[in-house]
Amino acid sequence: MAVLVMFFVAAALAAAGGAALVEHTFVVSQVKLNRLCNDTLVTVVNGQFPGPAIEVNEGDSVAVQVINKSPYGLTIHWHGVKLQLNCWADGAGMITQCPVQPNKNFTYRFDVAGQEGTLWWHAHVGSLRASIHGALIIRPRSGASSYPFPKPHKEIPIVIGLQIYTSRTNARCQESGLLN
């Protein structure tokens, strides 16, 4: 039995050998943005629209502290991330967690295992997903040499968002089409 336990401990340490802990702090607040000659109060992360990109390697652990300085409760959803053994970090408001209330903090902790690619993160409460979102880039553990194409000269994540020109409480739900 002791040999079996030693084997599993050694296997776990070997698997975690190249993994890193990637930490981010998301300060959610409201800023005034001018779009199409209109000043609009928009809820954003770290004063940015769209929010910051998170770049990790497959196998890394992620910790994102959300500091909510906005007047709205919110959650952050890691879209497309396989949250095996970390499902409580999914950020589905009122399903896997209650919203992070104004002037409160919450730290999301999860591992990115068994996948790579460009995904995204976004708010998962009401229309806040229109302005609280950003790229989540999971690179292969073995580096760019494992991609089936030549290494690009430069990488620029493109995040397309939606601007809402009405108050958060007056925004109507989309009745048809694909809205993710």
Describe the predicted segments one by one.
Residues 8-180:
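Histidine-centered copper-binding motifs that mark active-site loops
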Residues 1-9:
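Sec-dependent signal peptide recognition
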